[in-house]
């Protein structure tokens, strides 16, 4: 890479660190090209991105961002996975790490919070924003459904009473 290309790459990576909801850093030594391509396609399908950058350039790109606290993670062969949705990158990376023992999660960041490997693992177990929205809508709809059931119940009970009286009169 020439100096101008490096400057452009650092600027681009700096924007990524500023705009991402979450960033995960992991070692990938020993991962084959096919496995890496599979990982990248899974991340892309979920709405995230995977980049491999020189550690020195990544550290420079971190300067002036909220994620600056994770500069110590960039040692060895590292990859950077990021997404706008804070739950996507940790989930996809942890799923890939389960099937491929050569991927070792080092940590990451979520906004201004620097995460260690355990925090990334626990973040991956949380439901996504869409799942949380669905649960919230379900909770909001439940009382309305119950109210409709309660309002309809007296009318149906009254109808059963009239039906019972009608059958009683017919039998007599």
Curated annotation (Swiss-Prot):
Q: Name one GO biological process term.
A: translation
A GO cellular component annotation here is:
large ribosomal subunit
One Pfam family name from the record? Answer: Ribosomal_L10
Keyword match Transmembrane helix: no
Q: Per its UniProt record, what SUPFAM superfamilies does this chain match?
A: Ribosomal protein L10-like
Keywords on record: Ribonucleoprotein, Ribosomal protein, RNA-binding, rRNA-binding
* PROSITE patterns attached to this UniProt entry: RIBOSOMAL_L10
One GO MF term, please?
structural constituent of ribosome
Annotated function:
Forms part of the ribosomal stalk, playing a central role in the interaction of the ribosome with GTP-bound translation factors.
What assembly does the database describe for this protein?
Part of the ribosomal stalk of the 50S ribosomal subunit. The N-terminus interacts with L11 and the large rRNA to form the base of the stalk. The C-terminus forms an elongated spine to which 3 L12 dimers bind in a sequential fashion forming a heptameric L10(L12)2(L12)2(L12)2 complex.
Family label: Belongs to the universal ribosomal protein uL10 family.
Protein name in the entry: Large ribosomal subunit protein uL10
Q: What is the lineage of its organism?
A: Bacteria, Pseudomonadati, Pseudomonadota, Alphaproteobacteria, Hyphomicrobiales
